[in-house]
Structure formats: C-alpha cells, structure tokens
Amino acid sequence: SNYHELYKVSDQYVQDRLAQASKDGYVEVAFGLRVRTPLLAQVMWGTGRVPYEAQAEGRTAGNALGQSYGLLNNRAAVAFMKKVWESPYRYDIKPEALVHDAIYIVIRDDLHVVDWANRHLIQEMRWQELPEIQHDTVKLGAALDIFWPDWSNATTLPNDSPKEVIKELCTKVKHEFTKP
C-alpha cells in the first residue's frame, strides 16, 4: 500500500527492532524504556512460522516503538515550563494540556510574552538528542498557533519571526474578526 511505500524506512526499523527483541526478550523504546516481549523471545521473528500470539505481541511492541516517542512532547513541555518558571514570564504562561504531539498553553496577550514563547517553545520542540532520532536531513519541528478569538480560528506564527511579524499577523486577524 501507499503507507508502506512512504514509510518503508520506518517499517524496516520496526522489523529490525522486533528481530532483536526475539533475541533479547524485550524491545527498547523511547528514553531507554524496555517493553518485555516474552513470546517474541521464543520465536524466530521474520520467518513464516510465527504463532498468532507472538505476531500480536510483535504488533504491540511495534506500536510501542512508535508511540513511545510521544514522550518527546512531554519532554519539550517540561523543559519549556522550566524555562518559563525561571523567566520574568512565569505568571504570563500557563500549561493547560498535552495531547499527543501538541502542547496547549495559555499566554498573556502581550507581544513580548508571545515572542518569548514562540522562540523557546519551538526550541524545545526541535530537541533531537536521542541517538536513534538524530538524522542529517530529517529534523523535528513545530509551530506555535495562536487561537483567537476562540478555538475555531488558528493563526500559525512563523518560527523565529521578529516581533514585528507577530504583531502584523495578530493585528490582521484581530481586524478580520472585529469588522463591523
């Protein structure tokens, strides 16, 4: 299928890790967490003779491999909030929720605060220090969306944009929603 063509490198990575799990009895996921795979340890992964139960364990371990990297979002949120609490903006930026790959924060309606958050949050979202996710061309990234006047309208701020660009974008959106 198209999915498997598009993600063949990722698919191969998972298959290689599952083959290793059949030798080790566990698969190592994000941040070194080990997920035990006792059934895989009893089979030769990748052969045509893997029992259904071991195949199911392989699917679960494969899902854990990919889904565990959702912890990168948590790592970014913790690192960002540490910076917030050490900054003059500790009362201006509040964490609200983490959902999969999104960090929801409430930011005071102040250009300096928004600019600071746009720089520091994106810096933490770009973090790529785990050896298994380091790559010369594929980089992690993110963008800060401002929702105004409500959750149905998102304005994406360009990364590393100067304050003037942020102000211009936000002013434009405000004028669109306050037209008579």
Task: Kindly label every feature range from the protein language model.
Residues S1-P180:
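Conserved catalytic core of nucleotide polymerization and phosphodiester-bond processing enzymes
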